[in-house]
């Protein structure tokens, strides 16, 4: 594992965590995973918990925080020669919703382009949810 990947991994996690805290969504960095695939691409997954009625907001904050981390990586790559930004091609957000005795688990996936559209303000949150609606699953 290269030192650049380790640093980028830490920076990515910190940016995601700080953005979630900004939106008052608690997050555990141990429930984040940034994986480098054999082809050199990256996948990111995050597990979050919501209250009964706000799982959509928590899910959106997860995707927004990944978008902020991607922007941070890109701006850092412009400043530092030889540094390549860590941009996950696919991101999966899993939200645990406490409903009755058993929790409901809702997952959704989005591509880097979809997340970038959301974080850049090109689509609003409702349009973003329509973009990813086919990937949303209840487990």
Residue ranges and their predicted role:
Residues 51-55:
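Short histidine-centered catalytic/ligand-binding loop motif
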Residues 1-2, 93:
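Intrinsically disordered/low-complexity terminal segments and short unstructured peptides
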Residues 56-78:
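Short, non-transmembrane amphipathic alpha-helical segments
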Residues 2-11:
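Boundary at the C-terminal end of the N-terminal hydrophobic targeting segment
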């Amino acid at each position: 594992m290269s030192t650049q990947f380790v640093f980028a991994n830490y920076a990515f996690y910190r940016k995601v965590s700080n953005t979630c805290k900004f939106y008052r969504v608690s997050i555990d960095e141990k429930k984040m995973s940034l994986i480098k695939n054999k082809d050199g691409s990256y996948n990111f997954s995050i597990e979050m918990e919501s209250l009964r009625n706000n799982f959509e907001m928590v899910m959106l904050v997860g995707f927004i925080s990944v978008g902020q981390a991607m922007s941070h990586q890109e701006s850092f790559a412009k400043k530092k020669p030889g540094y390549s930004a860590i941009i996950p091609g696919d991101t999966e957000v899993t939200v645990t919703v406490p409903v009755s005795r058993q929790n409901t688990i809702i997952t959704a996936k989005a591509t880097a382009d979809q997340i970038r559209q959301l974080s850049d303000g090109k689509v609003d949150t409702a349009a973003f949810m329509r973009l990813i609606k086919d990937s949303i699953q209840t487990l």
